[in-house]
Amino acid sequence: MSNTWLVVGLGNPGPDYSHTRHNIGFMVAEELASRIGASFKSNKSRALVAEGRLGMGGPKLVLAKPQTFMNLSGGPTSALAKFYDLGADNVIAVQDEIDIPFNTIKLKIGGGEGGHNGLRDISKALGAKEYLRVRVGVGRPPGGQGDAAGHVLKVFSTAEKKELPFLIQDAADAVELLISDGLLAAQQKFHPAK
């Protein structure tokens, strides 16, 4: 397994989307870039990319924010994986998840995309579903009713905005733990006991 990890924060480019639920992946990628002292730069893969090491002599992180809109995230992800010679097992996608309550993080590898078109496009472009996912709960519309697509394109509520910095930090911690200690250890920390 390579000592380089591609972490793809899913979101939509542009100021109209920057503070929406759908862009939580971008927010987590930005937090990780801040932690490793890296800046995002344009890349011919159609993504903003930041690179650095996780700790002194630690694994290399390639952080990506695809600039193709959410549903076309696969092209930039696949291009970067190919450029860095990474298999799907060294790719981590950070995504919003409406089927998980706000302020909750779930981690998994592979499986279905749960109706998330960004993940669907990544799976298709990589030719594999066996990549890690950091699923950041953004919850459903109030009352569980309403337009889910419209909900993820809205900004967080006032109450959610107070908790958002902590959620972003936790999701970034989850990415770091996935890389340093593996999926099982990260799940034990972030999945509440039943």
Swiss-Prot record:
It holds the Pfam family Pept_tRNA_hydro. It is found in: Cytoplasm. The record marks 12 as: Discriminates between blocked and unblocked aminoacyl-tRNA. It is an enzyme of class 3 (hydrolase). Gene3D superfamilies: Peptidyl-tRNA hydrolase. Its EC number is 3.1.1.29. GO terms for cellular component: cytoplasm. Keywords: Cytoplasm, Hydrolase, RNA-binding, tRNA-binding. The record marks 96 as: Stabilizes the basic form of H active site to accept a proton. GO terms for molecular function: peptidyl-tRNA hydrolase activity; tRNA binding. It comes from the Bacteria. GO terms for biological process: protein quality control for misfolded or incompletely synthesized proteins; rescue of stalled ribosome. TRNA binds at residues 17, 69, 71, 117. It catalyses: an N-acyl-L-alpha-aminoacyl-tRNA + H2O = an N-acyl-L-amino acid + a tRNA + H(+). PANTHER family: PEPTIDYL-TRNA HYDROLASE (PTHR17224:SF1). Belongs to the PTH family. Hydrolyzes ribosome-free peptidyl-tRNAs (with 1 or more amino acids incorporated), which drop off the ribosome during protein synthesis, or as a result of ribosome stalling. Monomer. This is Peptidyl-tRNA hydrolase.
